[in-house]
Amino acid sequence: MKIIHTADWHLGKILNGKQLLEDQAYILDMFVEKMKEEEPDIIVIAGDLYDTTYPSKDAIMLLEQAIGKLNLELRIPIIIISGNHDGKERLNYGASWFEHNQLFIRTDFTSINSPIEINGVNFYTLPYATVSEMKHYFEDDTIETHQQGITRCIETIAPEIDEDAVNILISHLTVQGGKTSDSERPLTIGTVESVQKGVFDIFDYVMLGHLHHPFSIEDDKIKYSGSLLQYSFSEAGQAKGYRRVTINDGIINDVFIPLKPLRQLEIISGEYNDVINEKVHVKNKDNYLHFKLKNMSHITDPMMSLKQIYPNTLALTNETFNYNEENNAIEISEKDDMSIIEMFYKHITDKELSDIQSKKIKNILENELRKED
C-alpha cells in the first residue's frame, strides 16, 4: 500500500504583504503531476489547508481545483483533517456526500472513535481541538493541557483498537521537542501545548501536521510532512515536499520527496553598497528576499532602491546596530554625556555630528545640568 502524507498548505497565505497564491498554485500543480506518477492508494492531508478561518474566494477555488483533480479526475481517496488555522464549519461543508467519492473530511476530534478503513489499514483521525473543547466534551475540569486532552482522546479508543491490523493516527499538534518556525501559530496561550511521544504508543504510525519542518522530530514512526512551501524567513533553506509511506506485509517505511517551488525564501547579509552594486551572491533575483545590511542609514529609502533590482524584497533589517554590547558598555561607562551621544549618533548614521548639532546638544546638556543644580 502507498500513502502520500502532506499538510500545512496554508492557502491564501500573505507574507509581509505579499500574496502567495501564484506560488501555491504552482506547487499544487506540481503536486498533482507527482500524484499521477505516484498512483497512491490514498492521500492524507493533516490540517491547515487554509491560512485563515475565513479564506478568500481565490484560496477556496485553489483548494477545490486541487482536490477535484486528485479525487475526481485521478480517483484517489483522500483523508483531510482540520488544523488550528482552518475554519471547521467551512472545511466540513458537504462532507457527508463527499464520502461517496472517498473524500473523507474530519473536523471534530471525536471522529477518532470512527476510523476510516482503506485496504485493510485503519486511519484514526484526530483533528485540532482546543483544550477547552476537550475539557467540555469529557466534562473533566482536570484537563488543562493538550497532553492531557490528547491522552484522554486516545484512551477512549484504546480498548477497541485492532492490534492485528495496521493502525495509523492522523493529527495536527506539536510533539514535544519538535522544531518550530515563526509561521506556526501557537496552539494554546498560557498552557503547555506539546504532547509527549509516548501518547501514541498504540499506533503503528503517526502522520502529523502543524510543524513546518519535515524533519521536526527524529522518530521511526512519528512524522511531520512539513509545509508545501516556506512560509517564514525562519524556514529559509528548508526543503519542502511530501512523504511517501509504504506498507508491505505490515512493515512501514517512509521517504521524504522534495518539491521545487517557483520561488524560495532567502536571507542576504552584507554591505548595502555591495548589494546595490550586485556584488553579493543571490541565488535568484526573483526569490523572496530578506536583506540584513550594514551602512545604509544615510539612504533615504533603501527598500525602494533594493526593489528596483530585487523586485521581491519583502524584509529589510538594519544591521548597523550589531556590535559587542559588553565591550561598548565598558567603553561607555568611561565616557562623559557628550561623548556617549557622539558615539550613539555615529552608530546610527555612520557620520560625525556637525558643529551646529554639537553646539545645540551641548546647550541642552548644560541647561539640564543647571536645572539639577
Curated annotation (Swiss-Prot):
Recount the UniProt induction comment for this entry: Induced by ciprofloxacin and up-regulated by LexA.
MF terms per GO, please? 3'-5' exonuclease activity; DNA binding; DNA exonuclease activity; endonuclease activity
Whether Nucleus counts among this entry's keywords is no
List the residue ranges forming a coiled coil, or say none.
none
Among Pfam families, the record links this protein to: Metallophos (PF00149), SbcD_C (PF12320)
Gene3D superfamilies per the UniProt record, alphabetical: 3.60.21.10
Q: Which CDD domains match?
A: MPP_Mre11_N
A GO BP term here is: SOS response
The alphabetical list of record keywords is: DNA damage, DNA recombination, DNA repair, DNA replication, Endonuclease, Exonuclease, Hydrolase, Nuclease, SOS response
Top-level taxon of the source organism: Bacteria
Which InterPro entries does the entry mention?
Calcineurin-like_PHP_ApaH, DNA_Repair-Maintenance_Comp, Metallo-depent_PP-like, Mre11_N, SbcCD_nuclease, SbcD, SbcD_C
Known role: SbcCD cleaves DNA hairpin structures. These structures can inhibit DNA replication and are intermediates in certain DNA recombination reactions. The complex acts as a 3'->5' double strand exonuclease that can open hairpins. It also has a 5' single-strand endonuclease activity. Is probably part of the SOS regulon and involved in DNA recombination and repair.
Per UniProt, subunit arrangement is: Heterodimer of SbcC and SbcD.
Q: Which PANTHER family match?
A: COMPONENT OF ATP-DEPENDENT DSDNA EXONUCLEASE, NUCLEASE SBCCD SUBUNIT D
Q: Which family does it belong to?
A: Belongs to the SbcD family.
NCBIfam families assigned: sbcd (TIGR00619), sbcd_Staph (NF041753)
Q: Any idea what this protein is called?
A: Nuclease SbcCD subunit D
